[in-house]
Amino acid sequence: MAETEKNLQSLDHIPIDVLFEILVKLPAKSVARFLCVSKVWATMIRGEVFIRSFTSYSSPQKQPRLLFALVDCLRLYNKMLYFFSKSTLVSTPLLPWDPAPGPPVKPHRFGLFWRARCLRYLPKHYKSLMEELKPKPLVVEEQPDFLSRKELRHENSSYVHGLMSFLCSGEQVIFNPSIGKSITLPTIKTSGIISQSFLGYDPINAQYKVLCLTNVTRFCEHQVLTLGAQNSSWRMIQCSTPHYCGEKSLCIDGILYYSAFTSFTTVLVRFDVRAESLEVASKFPEGLKSSNGITLINYHGKVAVVSKNYHNDHHDFNLWVLEDTKKQQWSNVLVSFHTGVTGQFHGGLEVLGTSDMGEIVFAPNHFEEFVVYFLDQKSNRIRSVLL
């Protein structure tokens, strides 16, 4: 015991600048272990300067990886949420109703449904901080607290800058899918019920904020919480246009967009994460017949509303791109291809977003194999990735 304390004391004598240069060059998994060495090390590693230096140093060495989630809907309310990456060979259940061991997941066309809103890309500038996903046993040795809760319900999730936010048994949970860690946010003070909870990221101040919408009367109240801030608490903010929120959200360059409904029409609401201001960005385009089944994606740095049309022999997707917020000007892009491209998966495709290369990413609703499609509009070519 005395020898261990002596070794730890000798580590604290390493100059901070030298220690900084050593740690910033290590893999993310090793850096995470060093959080336990001492308070000095933990403070430095969690500091904003170290995080930014670490990401800028390590990001060129990493390739974008695909992360997606599956919900075992055969269990009805007895659900399990599985996360996979391109290198994962065995699934890891992260949201089991019953933590008892179970058989490995076997994909079945009608047994598992792709939850498209959970599939996103790990950002280049953040993914190096997240532990590499490797094959893990089906039973997690140290499960997060919320895994043992009963009446488990996985609600609409949002994925931003490496973290996920969703409602779990009425509580708001922030989850890091790469390392399997989660936190439960402070209880929000409201007389109503939580309608939606969206996660946003401010790249200038490197801050995450949660926008919680509660259904008190006919319209929603809005409260904001900053993650990681000292004495952080929920703050009430106002919107000049009363509205009721939809399900879809998207964060681009510090602006969180989400669909909403006013007394007269469907709108796109804009939340400035840094300024904590809310306003209606635009009404939905007139050519969009229905807001049901829409998706919000980042289309070359602009927010786009995606709707799909059903046909027997081809897939049609309408991309409504918000070109000018002040003029509420939208452009329309039609994406169409024959079902022969996707073979047995033509039962239904979803647009999941865009890749770092600007490709539009599709995935089937029902499947027998894990497959993702990438459409390059410039070359008009489609490639598939079988996981």
From Swiss-Prot:
Enumerate the spans annotated as F-box domain.
8-54
Lineage, top-rank taxon, reads Eukaryota
Q: What is this protein called?
A: Putative F-box protein At1g47800
Q: What does UniProt give as the signal peptide span?
A: none
Q: Which SMART domains match?
A: FBOX
Matching PANTHER family: BNAA05G37150D PROTEIN-RELATED (PTHR31111), F-BOX ASSOCIATED UBIQUITINATION EFFECTOR FAMILY PROTEIN-RELATED (PTHR31111:SF132)
Q: List the disulfide bonds.
A: none
Q: Name one Pfam family in it.
A: FBA_3
